[in-house]
């Protein structure tokens, strides 16, 4: 296990006068204790963990809810606010009643060393964050316990690089892995390995790097490994779809190879493999995203004016199991109308997926959407109706991350709420 000096953990106070404050809880039947904890939001559970050692023991022994899914039925939402000079991280707990939901802000202990960051991914309640200023720092972070770990730097560094990340957990190996795909121009100062196409720099060289974390991780074993050259050129964004222990990416079309591909990276055997695509028009013509909805791999295909279709792969890896489950029409939230001088300009980049993001399916069957990084909207597929979600304290500009609350760390069992 990595040493205590390697990462920061919150301290737990001792019981006052040696008397167990949690004695009252311990005397209750286990089913009652489990029922009590299941009704509490993760933010409340996190606070109780640090009241005293007795309460922490009770929560650890009786409050555990095992889950193998990275998409919880009652997720909380993390809102990454890209404010000038210093970024912020807020959260909304969707397990509370809608009228009582308030946006809360996390205190980031690493803010001085990494004031601006991107969220690489969320898995089992742990976040992987990357330095958006210098691209040389990565952190593992649990926002509810404030545990954090700065990951080591890669031995191989390149100038003028483009990065694609992935972060996930494999249920069989019980290992977390951080995937880093580097596209670069080469070590020389000339133009070898680089060319311009359609006004954009294209990098011809690449390297795939990976780092593993588990209960067996030590300071000596915590290091990056090279997997060689990347077999594909992916769209520059982190993987948002972790399904079946695999990260999923979309390839970038090339001049002579316009066909986009779906590619998975298996966190167990560390191999890239192509995934069959649905038989629908527009996949090669427009941009699209892969997301995880209720444990299924889904493809969001964008059309004009914010319209989109959601295709679901019901049986993983089987092409014939793809089916179009949802079609969502054009909608302009009131919040966007009030903040835009010319509201119709919003649809300019709609086909590139820069207007609407599909986040998750809610318990009531509604689809949670994010519009232009400013407004959250719930869409009812049965009624075909949209509802703007207005929460107190919502930042003016944010990137939403669907998150499963946990009190665990990378070297401990999962405790998901």
UniProtKB/Swiss-Prot annotation:
GO biological process, one term: positive regulation of cell population proliferation
Residue ranges occupied by any F-box domain in the UniProt entry: 22-68
GO cellular component, one term: plasmodesma
Any Pfam family the entry gives: Beta-prop_KIB1-4
PROSITE patterns hit by this protein: FBOX (PS50181)
PANTHER family (UniProt xref): BNACNNG10540D PROTEIN (PTHR31672), F-BOX DOMAIN-CONTAINING PROTEIN (PTHR31672:SF2)
Name this polypeptide is given: F-box protein At3g07870
Organism encoding this protein: Arabidopsis thaliana
């Amino acid at each position: 296990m990595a040493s205590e000096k390697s990462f920061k953990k919150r301290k737990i106070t001792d019981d006052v006068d040696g008397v167990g404050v949690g004695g009252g809880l311990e005397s209750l039947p286990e089913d009652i204790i489990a029922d009590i904890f299941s009704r509490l939001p993760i933010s409340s559970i996190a606070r109780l963990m640090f009241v005293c050692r007795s309460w922490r023991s009770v929560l650890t022994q009786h409050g555990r809810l095992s889950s193998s899914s990275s998409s919880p039925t009652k997720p909380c939402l993390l809102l990454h606010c890209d404010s000038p000079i210093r970024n912020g991280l807020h959260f909304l707990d969707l397990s509370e009643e809608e009228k009582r939901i308030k946006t809360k802000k996390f205190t980031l202990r690493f803010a001085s060393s990494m004031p601006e960051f991107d969220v690489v991914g969320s898995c089992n309640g742990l976040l992987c964050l990357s330095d958006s200023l210098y691209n040389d720092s990565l952190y593992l972070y649990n926002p509810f316990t404030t545990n954090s770990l700065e990951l080591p730097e890669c031995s191989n560094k390149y100038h003028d690089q483009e990065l694609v990340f992935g972060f996930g957990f494999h249920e069989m190996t019980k290992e977390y892995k951080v995937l880093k795909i580097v596209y670069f121009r080469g070590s020389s100062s000339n133009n070898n390995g680089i060319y311009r196409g359609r006004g954009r720099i294209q990098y011809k060289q690449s390297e795939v790097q990976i780092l593993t974390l588990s209960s067996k991780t030590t300071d000596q074993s915590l290091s990056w490994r090279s997997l060689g050259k990347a077999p594909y050129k992916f769209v520059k964004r982190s993987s948002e779809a972790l399904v079946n222990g695999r990260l999923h990416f979309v390839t970038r079309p090339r001049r002579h190879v316009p066909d986009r591909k779906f590619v998975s990276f298996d966190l167990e055997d560390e191999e890239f493999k192509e995934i069959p695509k649905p038989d629908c028009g527009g996949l090669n013509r427009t941009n699209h995203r892969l997301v995880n909805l209720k444990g299924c791999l889904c493809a969001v295909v964008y059309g004009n004016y914010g319209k989109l279709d959601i295709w679901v792969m019901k049986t993983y890896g089987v092409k014939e199991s793809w089916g179009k489950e949802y079609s969502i029409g054009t909608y302009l939230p009131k919040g966007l109308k009030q903040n835009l001088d010319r509201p119709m300009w919003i649809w300019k980049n709609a086909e590139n997926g820069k207007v609407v993001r599909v986040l998750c399916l809610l318990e009531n069957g509604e689809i949670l959407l994010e519009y232009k990084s400013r407004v959250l909207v719930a869409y009812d597929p049965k009624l075909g109706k949209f509802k703007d979600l207005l929460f107190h304290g919502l930042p003016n500009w944010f990137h939403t991350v669907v998150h499963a609350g946990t009190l665990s760390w990378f070297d401990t069992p999962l405790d998901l709420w």
